[in-house]
Curated annotation (Swiss-Prot):
Disulfide bonds: none annotated. GO terms for cellular component: cytoplasm. InterPro entries: DUF167 (IPR003746), YggU-like_sf (IPR036591). It comes from Pectobacterium carotovorum subsp. carotovorum (strain PC1). Gene3D superfamilies: YggU-like. This is UPF0235 protein PC1_3453.
Length: 96
């Protein structure tokens, strides 16, 4: 399975999260997932909230359009971004 797939007007992205990183960034592929480093610690949902905000900014959508479908409590997540207005260059290469 690919890290990023299109489902109608949405993107479904399989992620591997690295919390407590030095900066927020999309790192690249990690196996069959897209690795994302975020600065927030994995405590009380802070990392999930920060991830949602970061991805919303990268794809230029409202935070409510970024939904964690699977993996709320782990590093491996599946998210859905509805109506992305912008596809970051480092992500576009991995879309199937």
């Amino acid at each position: 399975m690919s890290a990023i797939t299109r489902h109608g007007d949405a993107l479904v992205i399989r992620l591997y999260i690295q919390p407590k990183a030095s900066r927020d960034q999309i790192v690249g592929l990690h196996g069959d997932e897209l690795k994302v480093a975020i600065t927030a610690p994995p405590v009380d949902g802070q990392a999930n909230a920060h991830l949602t905000k970061f991805l919303a900014k990268q794809f230029r959508v409202a935070k409510s359009l970024v939904v964690i479908e699977k993996g709320e409590l782990g590093r491996h997540k599946q998210i859905r971004i509805t109506h992305p207005q912008h596809i970051p260059a480092d992500v576009a290469d991995f879309i199937e």
